[in-house]
């Protein structure tokens, strides 16, 4: 199929929607799905699996897209192959196999899926004209996809069913096939040699740049407590009487659309760093609202906290990718995004899964039911990356592109 360049750019919006729709269906449903299959004990390990997989593959595939292979083709191969293991993972639960098999299949899927977000980011930022305006708009299609996935799951009554994961796998397969219709994004680094280049380890050289180092570390620290959002909030919703937790978790995506539009309209008028600061502040406020909901016992306050997830994600992580792209050379684009995904998704994901799980066991589970203490502890921790970023980046002059 031959498509014009403009139509291939439009295809980026379709692919973004289909990338985020599958996790929107099963990620927020997973705590309840595992409970249905008497496997709630698996939740911390299942939450930590994607970060572990990303730890293995993100930098390697990021370097591969910079050095050897078209990013859109690599994205298609990973999308299709990952769909099979996603399907087997949830099928193993339906078939009544030991829950450990779910970890095995999802572990392979995690390795395959780890580079996907970094690769689609590279494709968009490489091919979009006026990225400061158009990048948030195309990212908004991912928001719509996640929201549609959650709403469809609840509409079909799959909030507690492994069928949510099977349907997600079918959509993931279609996404992978459509990736081959994306704009061509060829490799740009033809000079790097050696095993460090092959493994993507040259990306760690970016940490020598003060501004990038502070941004990477602050983002990673903030992402640690954020793991509790998808890991614990669905449980909190059910505890407080929600009958459709997966659909209600999409409230954040509704506000995220407006945040994306505001970023597109205002991104060229204000420095990117200030959007990141706003995202960090709203993240702390979000945890504060969850703590207040625990004190008042009000489901509506939880909904307000969920709504803030949209601006938090947009102003910190979408803007953060733009922040990086402006500060690295073309030959490091894929690896810079892969390192970002590695730190916020892998390192922070692993630390967050176990630390938030431990904190939950000590404050909420086992009859304690102290939701307020749980969320206040996360709010206090989130102040650390905010202060670090304010001192290390906002308080310093902007660095030039290296």
Summary of predicted features, one role per range:
Residues 89-93, 172-186, 346, 374-402:
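Multi-pass alpha-helical transporter architecture, strongest
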């Amino acid at each position: 199929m031959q498509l014009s360049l403009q139509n291939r750019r439009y295809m980026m919006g379709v692919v973004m929607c289909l990338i985020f729709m599958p996790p929107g269906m099963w990620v927020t449903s997973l705590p309840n799905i595992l409970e249905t299959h008497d496997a709630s004990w698996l939740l911390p390990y299942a939450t930590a699996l994607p970060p572990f997989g990303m730890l293995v593959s993100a930098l390697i595939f990021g370097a591969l897209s910079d050095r050897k292979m078209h990013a859109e083709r690599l994205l298609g191969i990973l999308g299709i192959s990952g769909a099979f293991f996603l399907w087997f993972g949830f099928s193993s639960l339906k078939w009544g196999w030991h829950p450990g098999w779910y970890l095995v299949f999802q572990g392979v899927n995690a390795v395959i899926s780890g580079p996907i977000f970094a690769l689609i980011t590279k494709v968009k930022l490489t091919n979009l004209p006026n990225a400061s305006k158009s990048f948030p708009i195309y990212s908004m299609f991912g928001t719509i996809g996640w929201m549609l996935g959650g709403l469809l799951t609840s509409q079909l009554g799959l909030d507690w069913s492994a069928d949510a994961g099977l349907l997600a796998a079918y959509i993931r397969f279609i996404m992978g096939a459509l990736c081959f219709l994306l704009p061509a994004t060829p490799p740009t680094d033809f000079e790097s040699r050696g095993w460090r280049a092959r493994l993507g380890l040259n990306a760690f050289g970016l940490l020598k740049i003060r501004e990038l180092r502070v941004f990477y570390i602050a983002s990673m620290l903030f992402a640690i407590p954020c793991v509790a959002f998808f890991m614990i909030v669905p449980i909190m919703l059910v505890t407080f009487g929600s009958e459709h937790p997966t659909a209600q978790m999409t409230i954040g995506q509704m506000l995220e659309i407006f945040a994306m539009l505001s970023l597109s309209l205002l991104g060229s008028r204000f420095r990117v760093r200030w959007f990141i600061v706003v995202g960090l502040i709203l993240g702390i406020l979000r945890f504060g609202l969850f703590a207040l909901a625990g004190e008042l016992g009000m489901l509506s306050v939880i909904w307000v906290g969920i709504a803030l997830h949209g601006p938090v994600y947009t102003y910190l992580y979408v803007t953060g990718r733009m922040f990086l792209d402006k500060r690295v050379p073309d030959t490091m684009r894929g690896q810079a995004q892969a390192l970002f995904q590695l730190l916020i998704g892998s390192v922070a994901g692993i630390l967050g899964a176990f630390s938030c799980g431990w904190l939950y066991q000590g404050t909420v589970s086992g009859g304690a039911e102290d939701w307020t203490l749980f969320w206040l502890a996360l709010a206090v921790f989130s102040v650390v990356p905010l202060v670090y970023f304010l001192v290390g980046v906002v308080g310093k002059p902007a660095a030039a592109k290296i």
